[in-house]
Amino acid sequence: MLNELNNLFMILPNINPIIFSIGPFSISWYSLAYVVGILLGWFYATKIIEKFKPEITKKHIDDFITYAIIAIIVGGRLGYVLLYNPLKYFTNPIEILKTYEGGMSFHGATIGIIMAAYLFCQKYKINFLSLTDIITTVAPIGLFLGRIANFINCELYGRITNSSFGIIFPNSDLQPRHPSQLYEAFFEGLILFCILTYAVFRHDTLKKRGLNSGIYLIFYSLFRIIIEMFREPDIQIGFILDSLTMGQILSAPMLLLGSYLICRSNPK
């Protein structure tokens, strides 16, 4: 049967989620994605600041990195625990600490970053939207790498399909499925990065507080809502109101907020 399927669809090999281990110390694909994403985002943010001289300085970004790391990990994990699988983690709280096994929520990480950015701006007396405009410009880098890690780990895969895009994931039911992780990596990562880079370098959008943040929220939400149509819903949640997924519901407010930010943005 596998040979027949292999002739029709690509069968993804079962890749170890741990890249290597040295004693008790292990590096997972997830960890690598987060570390590389943060470093590349940090580097790109400093280059943007050097070129466009916005209100946010390089020192601000350097100081904010610690806030961002904590916000992404804590917010992403708690978001997943509370929104996607609360029963599992409340009955066995120690599982919450096992971030290396996966289970991070983008929407939770977003809330974490927003809270961290607000506290940081209050402390250093800088404009909140000026900081989020820089953050959202570099965020697609991390999104791209995170979705690639999801694909390697054979998780968050798509719905069953007979199309030529179908991939058989080794830890699934051997049904060909959409590689929705790659769809998200392409649109939420690569395409969104290109859109924001074009906006910054061609239209100097950093001069308008909140504009880049609004562009990011709108396009991310649209991409996520559409791609959720190809992604298998979380088994413990399933569909909501017969056809909606949790990802679509959580993306709707982001779409509205993005529209508001674009409408209110003005040169400063």
From Swiss-Prot:
UniProt keyword list: Cell inner membrane, Cell membrane, Membrane, Transferase, Transmembrane, Transmembrane helix
The organism's superkingdom is given as Bacteria
The UniProt entry's coiled-coil ranges are: none
Q: Which residues bind a 1,2-diacyl-sn-glycero-3-phospho-(1'-sn-glycerol)?
A: 147
Q: In terms of one coarse class, where is the protein primarily found?
A: membrane
Any transmembrane segments, and where? 18-38, 64-84, 101-121, 126-146, 181-201, 210-230, 237-257
* EC nos: 2.5.1.145
**Gene Ontology cellular component terms for the protein in this record:** plasma membrane
Report a single Gene Ontology molecular function: phosphatidylglycerol-prolipoprotein diacylglyceryl transferase activity
Give the pathway. Protein modification; lipoprotein biosynthesis (diacylglyceryl transfer)
GO biological process assignments? lipoprotein biosynthetic process
State the compartments where it is located: Cell inner membrane
Statement: the UniProt record of this protein carries the keyword Translocase: no
Quote the InterPro entries the UniProt record gives. Answer: Lgt
Top enzyme class, one word, equals transferase
Membrane-related topology note: Multi-pass membrane protein
Instruction: Indicate yes or no for the key word Nucleotide-binding.
Output: no
Name the job this protein performs. Answer: Catalyzes the transfer of the diacylglyceryl group from phosphatidylglycerol to the sulfhydryl group of the N-terminal cysteine of a prolipoprotein, the first step in the formation of mature lipoproteins.
Q: Which NCBIfam families match?
A: lgt (TIGR00544)
What does the similarity note say? Belongs to the Lgt family.
Name of the protein in question: Phosphatidylglycerol--prolipoprotein diacylglyceryl transferase
* Gene encoding the protein: lgt
